[in-house]
Amino acid sequence: MLTALCEDCRSAEAAYDRVDQSLGWLLAGDDQRYPQTPPELFPIAATGADGIHVGYVVHAPELAASDYPVAEFEPMDRDVGACLLGTSTIEAVEVLLSTRLLYDQLPFSHEWWPEVGARLRRLGIEPAPAKAQRHDDLRKPVAPTVPDGWKHMPSSDGVGVLAPATEFHPAPPDPMEERPDVGSVLDAASKHLYDFPATALWLLRECYWRTWTALDNDTFALCDAMVDCYHSLNRPSLAAVVDRRIARL
């Protein structure tokens, strides 16, 4: 994808500018995370406004995949979690370019666009207003492909928990209160940790989403318990993300 956008760029700086001019992305990495960024969202870019960042959502790192959904996360909007841009890199880029075609036309006025557009078409990317992301589409959560025998439980952070169905308690948990009792949630998650770690993780993430701004001992306890859940699910890379979060709090 970057090759199609930047094949004729003569420097890293020129490639960086090309991505910004075409997609409105400032290429970035893990430093874009906020305390409430879902661990499964791995930032690749920022927009330069209000902390908004874009990344790949990796629900289950143990599942081999050649591509992942792309989501946008706006940390200043506490009511909205990660929002789907595209189920793949190609779809996300096509949606972004189509949105710019509909609203501002900016990439298409550059002298490099005809050549870049031709390369993108060879990848199957053909921007069109009908493919644009309109304002009523901005709040789609990131729903993964669910393998046979697996289950996805949506969550308030827009990502949800994906795991083998046997890792969830047979009885779905009650909806989380807006002001949950953190101690009770920690106790419930602890009871599920070894037999039903996916349910435990869902409880902890829902509670954290509602309470993280307190930045108190409960916040750290929720994060520590999430680390245990990710290890129980054999997802050390996601446990490491939460460990880094703890270090930054």
Enumerate the predicted regions with their spans.
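A surface-exposed partner-binding patch
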Residues: 1-67, 72-76, 130, 136-249
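Compact, glycine/acidic-enriched structural inserts
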Residues: 63-116
